[in-house]
Amino acid sequence: MTPKPRVSGRYTAGIQKRRKPNPDQRRRELCDAAIQLLADDGAKGLSHLKVDARAGVPDGTTSFYFRTRSALLHAVAERMVELDLAILQGVADSPGPAGGASASTLAKVVIQTGEEPQLSRTRARYELTMQATRDPAIGATLQRATDAFTKLHHDILVQLLPHGADLAPEVVDDLSNITLTFINGLLLRFAHGDRIIESPEQVDGVLSAIVAGVLGSDQQGGLTHDGAALQPRRKRATPTR
């Protein structure tokens, strides 16, 4: 008898199952698992084997892609920067609220950072920030992200503010620095489980109040630009008769 030919579809399926995963995709998956571990267990709870278990891959997979714990942390920092920049760039590219009928995209993104799955990344980011104080390379990665975030936030603010493009650069610097400081503080409270603000509309309300306060200050343009806010304004000397 002539032997039956092998069923090509079944054979191909078997080959596909044994095919190695895309290395870049596997690295992203491992980094995402590590981010979740950082959020749940902190930096002390991060190890290659725990990442393997969280990602559902065979033992030794993480150490194959990232030989040392330092290499793993650096890759996680890069992955987090990649994810965060993509979200913030989406805010910069989006239109503002139409006619004041809805909250700004920026406010919506801020609230989303306090909700899963982004809440885990918020917590992991603070864990990495602490690691950066002892690892200059991680610090440099996070600083690049911070610089990019600051510029994007600056551009978003100009876009959202009425007549934002007409404001003096130093005034926009003040507004950007102060609102970004508020947002960073809010994210820290979210990371601790403190939902002091619940809705995008509340975020917009606070940001609007901050903007109004800065624009109404006789020190606008010097509140953060050159540290003027830390220096009490000198009183003019009263002329003696």
Language-model features, listed with the residues they occupy:
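Hydrophobic alpha-helical connector segments
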Residues: 75, 86-122, 172-179
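Hydrophobic/aromatic-rich alpha-helical bundle segments in the mid-to-C-terminal region
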Residues: 138-143, 160-241
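Short, basic, alpha-helical segments at the C-terminal edge of helix-turn-helix-like DNA-binding modules
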Residues: 78-84
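Helix-turn-helix
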Residues: 26-29, 33-71, 75
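Amphipathic alpha-helical segments used for helix-helix packing
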Residues: 103, 117-140
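N-terminal intrinsically disordered/low-complexity leader segments
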Residues: 1-25, 218-241
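Short, solvent-exposed amphipathic helices
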Residues: 141-152
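Residues in soluble alpha-helical coiled-coils and helical-bundle/repeat scaffolds
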Residues: 67-71, 97, 116, 133, ...
